Amino acid sequence: MSKEEAIEVEGTVIEPLPNAMFKVKLENDHIVLAHISGKMRKYFIKILPGDKVTVELSPYDLTRGRITYRAK
């Protein structure tokens, strides 16, 4: 996402899926499929259903995203 600016939105994890994928419900009630960013995977940050997260969405595909932050 280096060429275009990513869209950052807040959301809540609904359901964990295989391969570090998650269904996330955004603040505007859209549901997106999101994967964990590399740094979160590297440092073993656990994400559970109900966690508040920040998701980066590409302007080209608003149905998929990357989880970049888990709120405490």
UniProtKB/Swiss-Prot annotation:
It is found in: Cytoplasm. Keywords: Cytoplasm, Initiation factor, Protein biosynthesis, RNA-binding, rRNA-binding. One of its GO terms (molecular function) is rRNA binding. It comes from the Bacteria. Residues 1-72 form the S1-like domain. GO terms for cellular component: cytosol. Belongs to the IF-1 family. Component of the 30S ribosomal translation pre-initiation complex which assembles on the 30S ribosome in the order IF-2 and IF-3, IF-1 and N-formylmethionyl-tRNA(fMet); mRNA recruitment can occur at any time during PIC assembly. One of the essential components for the initiation of protein synthesis. Stabilizes the binding of IF-2 and IF-3 on the 30S subunit to which N-formylmethionyl-tRNA(fMet) subsequently binds. Helps modulate mRNA selection, yielding the 30S pre-initiation complex (PIC). Upon addition of the 50S ribosomal subunit IF-1, IF-2 and IF-3 are released leaving the mature 70S translation initiation complex. This is Translation initiation factor IF-1. It comes from Geotalea uraniireducens (strain Rf4).
